[in-house]
């Protein structure tokens, strides 16, 4: 089951996450969501908090602001994703914020499945659910997992 195709569930879950966000961040000027997974979640939380919300999307493999979106100098920006695993997409968003001379407030996601081994983000992540998922180097994969095909969700390599 996926909440992105069930708006009635997305609203409920995002309302709960929005409540956590409101307690942690007092002055949010803008929500930035990376495409694809963050768009619906970012929009829904922006709607609930009544905050301007934009998204960035990949152009030639690099996150870019398009469609007339911009981050103004001095804005307090919160990055919202559906799932944070390594933090790579979030860190690409951070670059857009810094290049605009705006301020990064932090990160929020429905699911935080990052670990100390994979996380590249230094700020705290607010999430609805924290999941501990072991990660393995290819050569150290347990035998019981070797026969299971690897899948890689996300949009990083979509052309």
Question: Where on the chain are the PLM-derived regions?
Answer:
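PRPP-dependent phosphoribosyltransferase catalytic core
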Residues: 94-159
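Hydrophobic Val/Ile/Leu positions in short beta-strands of Rossmann-like dinucleotide-binding domains
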Residues: 3, 79-80
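Short, glycine/charge-rich flexible loops or terminal/linker lids adjacent to PRPP-binding catalytic cores
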Residues: 36, 41-78, 88, 143
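Short glycine-rich phosphate-binding loop at a beta-alpha junction
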Residues: 26-35
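Conserved acidic residues
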Residues: 29, 75, 105
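Active-site-facing substrate-recognition patch
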Residues: 1-27, 156-159
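Acidic, divalent-metal-coordinating active-site segment for phosphoryl/phosphodiester hydrolysis
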Residues: 83-94
